[in-house]
Regions:
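Ankyrin repeat (ANK) core detector
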Residues: 47-55, 61, 65, 100-103, ...
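Ankyrin-repeat inter-repeat connecting loop/turn
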Residues: 89-92, 124, 174
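Boundary at the C-terminal end of the N-terminal hydrophobic targeting segment
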Residues: 22-26
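Ankyrin repeat boundary/linker residues
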Residues: 95, 128-130, 136, 178
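Ankyrin repeat A-helix N-terminal signature
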Residues: 104-110, 137-140, 145-160
Length: 184
């Protein structure tokens, strides 16, 4: 399995593409050196968790062939997009499943940076794609991720409150349903 893991890493990193929003003018944010370092550190944790997930999930690969590799590939795309965001500050980047830098900064507990991103024009109603039983359904918005508990690294509900306020102030729709029709 370890040999297969290395193969999956090589295959996955070779085919990752990050596409900006179609027909949108570029929106960027000037990241401070401290923010760039914060993103780099969080992104390294994300990659570490990904490799740990892969190592620990070999029984799942046996029971559900291909699903672990698909999940790994998705997380690797997030890692690469976040690195591209760190280098360019482009707020409109997205992975093929429509996860944005704002989604990831929220998920990684980078709340102050996420507030700055919202204020700089990051798409507050961007909705990822949720794969369920082979179908594509509307996924979560940044507001949903900001309201969820247990998704974040080093982030309490109290620390996320200014982010929730910023998202709502800048037009996040609190009634936009995600998977199974759940709203934030």
């Amino acid at each position: 399995m370890r040999q297969m893991t290395g193969t999956m890493l090589l295959l996955s990193s070779a085919v990752v593409m990050v596409a900006p929003w179609a027909h949108a003018e570029e929106k960027t944010i000037q990241l401070t050196e401290a923010e760039q370092q914060e993103i780099k550190t969080a992104n390294e944790k994300l990659l570490g968790l990904t490799l740990r997930f892969l190592h620990d999930s070999w029984p799942l690969e046996i029971m559900f062939p291909g699903e672990v590799q698909e999940e790994f590939h998705s997380i690797l795309q997030c890692h690469q997009m976040l690195e591209q965001f760190r280098q360019t500050g482009n707020l409109l980047l997205q992975t093929p499943d429509r996860t944005t830098p704002l989604h990831l900064c929220i998920a990684l507990g980078l709340n102050r940076l996420a507030v700055r991103m919202v204020e700089a024009g990051a798409p507050v109603n961007a909705q990822s794609i949720f794969m369920h039983d082979g179908t594509k359904e509307p996924g979560d918005t940044p507001l949903t991720w900001a309201c969820l508990s247990g998704l974040y690294m080093n982030s309490t509900a109290e620390e996320r409150l200014p982010l929730v306020h910023a998202l709502l102030k800048h037009g996040a729709d609190p009634d936009q349903p995600g998977p199974w029709g759940v709203t934030p």
